[in-house]
Amino acid sequence: MAMNDDALGLDEAYSVKTPEDNKRLYAKWAATYDSSFVDAKQYRYPKAISEVFDQVVTDSLSRVLDIGTGTGLTGMYLSRLRPDVVLDGMDISPEMLGQAKLKKRTDDSAVYRKLYERDLTRAVPNENAPYEALISSGTFTHGHLGPECLRNLLPLLANNGWLVVGVNNEHFESKGFAGELDALVALGAIKAPEILRIDVYEPGSVHYGDQARVIVTRAIN
């Protein structure tokens, strides 16, 4: 499929409706995602989330799970900031996970220890849980994961484990993430979250000014 401008980009990514739509889109896009979108559009979301994680997570962690791993950019950037952290990843697309498997740390070792093909709209089995933290960028957005999926992720966290999750700004408002977070606090499932804002694109990008919210909270298990 030809990829010119955003032909395979924001418009198509935001238009998917089902997990199968996601798998079809990213099967086409995986091999060129980093070059045709991340580099071409100056997309800094994975780097920005990793920087927020490094700033707000004050604990020394050993095991982190990357939710919606994609091509592995979030893990790659986090591994540079936290070189001692063991990273696992989950994504619905085997083709994207294939690209993530190729990502390297600065010492040329693999970024990820294990990669799992998972549909995150359902309960998520994982034999390596619980993790000390979950990180995610670009997954909670139009056509992808809604606020209800947060409940599927919490069982993967250890008690007091960190959740650092980016959410598309418009998606956060239209899908009622604030209400879901309030409900989780009321249930005693999470601590009161801090909501930050970050730029998704670099200055100079045609999309500069687009922002995401970052949910920062801790699990109570």
Outline where the language-model segments fall.
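A short acidic, Gly/Pro-enriched loop at the edge of an enzyme's catalytic core
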Residues: 124-134
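N-terminal, positively charged/glycine-rich alpha-helical extensions of SAM-dependent methyltransferases
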Residues: 1-32
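Class I S-adenosyl-L-methionine
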Residues: 189-221
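Class I SAM-dependent methyltransferase SAM/SAH-binding core
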Residues: 63-124
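Class I SAM-dependent methyltransferase Rossmann-like catalytic core
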Residues: 30-44
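Conserved beta-strand signature within the Rossmann-like core of class I S-adenosyl-L-methionine
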Residues: 160-168
